[in-house]
Each structure stands twice: as C-alpha cells, then as structure tokens.
Amino acid sequence: MAQREWVEKDFYKELGVSSDASPEEIKRAYRKLARDLHPDANPDNPAAGERFKAVSEAHNVLSDPAKRKEYDETRRLFAGGGFGGRRFDTGGFGGFNVGGDGAEFNLNDLFDAAGRSGGTNIGDLFGGLFGRASGGRPSRPRRGNDLETETQLDFVEAAKGVAMPLRLTSPAPCTNCHGSGARPGTSPKVCPTCNGSGVISRNQGAFGFSEPCTDCRGSGSIIEHPCDECKGTGVTTRTRTINVRIPPGVEDGQRIRLPGQGEAGLRGAPSGDLYVTVHVRPHKVFGRDGDDLTVTVPVSFTELALGSTISVPTLDGKVGVRVPKGTADGRILRVRGRGVPKRSGGHGDLLVTVKVAVPPNLDGAAQEALEAYAAAERASGFDPRAGWAGNR
C-alpha cells in the first residue's frame, strides 16, 4: 500500500529520471547513485548516508510495478494541492478541510478524480495513504522495504553452489531494544484512545469516517519510554554480515530472494526481503548452455580420422571421451550427466566440441608421412570439396 509521505516526495527527481522512465533506466540510475552514496564509500559523510536511504526508498517504490502504479495514481489525485483546484488537507481526511478559497469539498469531486486516474479504488488508496486498511479495520505494522544488492561468483562456484558471507549497510532491527522501540525493561502499551486499532471514527454530516489515531499515529500502541538508540523506531542503520547459500546452477544475472533479510520494519514489524543479483565471471575453459556444460578440446587430424580416446575436463575432474573413427572437425560429442546441477535434480550434459589443431612445423619423418598420405588420398579419389555449394 502507498504511504502518506508519498504525496510530498518526488521519487523520480530523487533518482534523476523522468516520470516515464523505463524499468531499465530506473535500475541504472539507482545503481550509479547507490554506488556513489553507499555508507562504506562515505564513512565520514552523514549527508551521503541520508541521501543513500532516500535513493533506496525511491528505488524500492519505482522498481515495483504495483507500488509505482499506486504512487503515480496518488500523485495524480493530489496534483495541484487537491481535487478540482481545491486544497485538501492530508492530515485530516475525516474533516474534509479545504483551502483558502473557502470552497466546500464535494464528494463527487473525489470519485470523479478517481475515475480520471484510471479506476483507482478510493478505499484502498486512502487506506494505504493513512496507514490502515480500507473499511476501518485495525492497522498492522508496516513491513520493511525490500533491498537489492549484487555479488560476483566464479564460474565453478555458480555451477556447483556456494555458501558466502554478504556485507550490507541498511536499516536493521535495533540491537538495544530488539526492534520493539521501547527502552530495555519496558514495553509498548496499547493505545487507550483507539484501543489498539490504530484508527478512530468521526462523523461529518451524514457520513461516518475513520482516520488514523493522532495519539499513536495509527500504530495502535504507545511507547512511553523510547529506546535511547533508535529513538522509538525499533530500527537503526548498521552494517551486518549475513551468510548466503547460493544454490547450484545459478546463472549470470539471476536474482535470488532471501526472505526477511531486507529492511527492518518499524517497531517490530516484519522485515522486507533481500534480492541478490548474481554476476558470474567467465571461465577460461568452460561455457554454459542452460544446464549443459560446454568445452572445446583441441585434437589432431589423426585422432579424428583414426579414432581415439581423449581426456576432457569436467567440474569434478577429468574423464575419458571416445572419439569415433572418421569424426568431423567441429563435431559435438555429448557426455550425459556431466553438466551443471539442475534445480529439479540430476545434472545436464557435457558438450565436447572437437577442433583440429594444425601443427605449425613438421619434422622430416612427419613431412614424408603426410606427403605419402596425400598421394594415397588422391589415388583413392577422395575430394574434401565434393558436394560443396561453392563448386557449383
């Protein structure tokens, strides 16, 4: 759901992109800013840390299609300070406060604006804006934002899987109050004004409305003695190291979701998720084709013509691969079950491409042998270009 603060924030400006920017443009802008503003790169610059958090929040909203749609609709509804040119006080939805022209707010303006914005559900929109569900149901603590990070793996690590530490600087549960927001030895109390629901009811003429409780700010609880470390939020920004298990067979560019490892929610609310984008370094010998492992092996002409068994590397050591007599240069030989581990179990195959290596120099014996072979080849009538389209 949208947040009340969205009305006053320009996430597009925060990332330096236009409001019609593509997802790829948003991702590129975020990566550049996050790299420049990351706390690890600016240890003595608190302003960079605050900007980093603002950029992360903007990316969290604009990178999620559902959140971006709701954000755009929210901004359209409140464009110009209100509906139909009248100012609307977002701090008092139940009161229908209007601006300096003294004009009376008409409910029809609200629903007309909703229709123009593409069918926005007013209950859902305002329920999200004011931190509660539509219909006046008790509010729930807001889940923390999702986080994104990147890591690089060697080819073999990506193929076989690996456990690795990942260092993050992000909002995390306060270690002093364990995320409750209350000073150690105390605990939050149920708000007596709203009885823990987070909303209070008001009447406006013939209509009844619910709005966030002003005493607990919609949380349903009151902290009389806030934690000294987090000032009652339950969250502090710190650097932490988590152990990540990268599953076997991960591919370059793939995203891995780690539930509950994202930004901490306020006052003990659930944490968001962490998405890790994996980048795989190329290997000097191996390649990949899905779950199949590919390798090109140099061979001699005689090994192809006469047949042989060659030694081929795999992820688990070398194996012998039989080259049938008369194998053509560039042929692919398949070795089943020697490829990359599959998510569904088992392994892909090893695809071996044989490539003739021509000797740059020949000694006398080799020269004579090849000349004798060439003469025998001509005598047999063999023409390597017979049937070739270039001869037509």
From Swiss-Prot:
Comment on bound cofactor: Binds 2 Zn(2+) ions per monomer.
Occurrences of domain J (ranges): 10-75
Major place of residence: cytoplasm
Classification lineage: Bacteria, Bacillati, Actinomycetota, Actinomycetes, Mycobacteriales
Protein name as annotated: Chaperone protein DnaJ 2
CDD domains per the UniProt record, alphabetical: DnaJ, DnaJ_C, DnaJ_zf
Alphabetical keyword list: Chaperone, Cytoplasm, DNA replication, Metal-binding, Repeat, Stress response, Zinc, Zinc-finger
Matches recorded under HAMAP family: DnaJ
GO MF annotation list: ATP binding; heat shock protein binding; unfolded protein binding; zinc ion binding
Known role: Participates actively in the response to hyperosmotic and heat shock by preventing the aggregation of stress-denatured proteins and by disaggregating proteins, also in an autonomous, DnaK-independent fashion. Unfolded proteins bind initially to DnaJ; upon interaction with the DnaJ-bound protein, DnaK hydrolyzes its bound ATP, resulting in the formation of a stable complex. GrpE releases ADP from DnaK; ATP binding to DnaK triggers the release of the substrate protein, thus completing the reaction cycle.
Record organism: Mycolicibacterium paratuberculosis (strain ATCC BAA-968 / K-10)
Localization per record: Cytoplasm
Binding locations of Zn(2+) 1: 174, 177, 227, 230
InterPro entries, per the entry: DnaJ, DnaJ_C, DnaJ_domain, DnaJ_domain_CS, HSP40/DnaJ_pept-bd, HSP_DnaJ_Cys-rich_dom, HSP_DnaJ_Cys-rich_dom_sf, J_dom_sf
Classification via SUPFAM superfamilies: Chaperone J-domain (SSF46565), DnaJ/Hsp40 cysteine-rich domain (SSF57938), HSP40/DnaJ peptide-binding domain (SSF49493)
